[in-house]
Regions:
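An acidic, low-aromatic, low-complexity terminal/linker signal
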Residues: 1-154
Length: 154
């Protein structure tokens, strides 16, 4: 799988404002603001770090940068699955840190205009609902938009 890069010029362009990078976990579509995504890489060997929470898989060396790797499935409390050819790592930058998110598969960057975004229902339907900031409606489907602040809290 080739790396997909989001360069600084693209990040600053006005059309990027309502763009979300969509990925899949357990058959459901999730999104993060495309401005947080640096690149997508294939799975790599991950060095385990002792005494870390279960959802933190460890670290990788990416071109000289040490990147912490989080398993999104485990963070959501979902059943782990074997990595396959679709499994990849989405490298994000958040609060001046680079992190990697292991996802089942990547889809694409999609525009979701503000009028198609609404807050999630108040009811906690599952144990990962706390990580959802908004729900985006795209065509006839729903994209669950992550709240990175809550998702990255320990």
């Amino acid at each position: 799988m080739a790396s997909i890069l989001v360069d600084d010029q693209t990040k600053e362009h006005d059309t990027i404002k309502d763009m979300f990078f969509i990925f899949e976990i357990d058959g459901e579509d999730y999104g993060v603001e495309v401005t947080n995504v640096i690149e997508i890489i294939p799975m790599k060997n991950i060095t385990k770090v002792p005494k870390m929470p279960d959802f933190i898989e460890g670290i990788i060396n990416l071109r000289g940068d040490l990147i912490g790797i989080l398993n999104v499935r485990k963070r959501f409390g979902k059943v782990p699955k074997e990595y396959d050819e679709q499994t990849c790592i989405v490298i994000i930058e958040y609060d001046q840190y680079k992190l990697g998110l292991i996802v089942d598969s990547v889809k694409a960057a999609r525009p979701i205009p503000p009028q198609n975004v609404s807050p999630p229902p108040n009811a906690k339907l599952n144990n990962y609902n706390q990580f959802i900031r908004n729900i985006g409606k795209v065509d006839n489907s729903v994209k669950l938009l992550l709240d990175l602040d809550r998702f990255l809290e320990q």
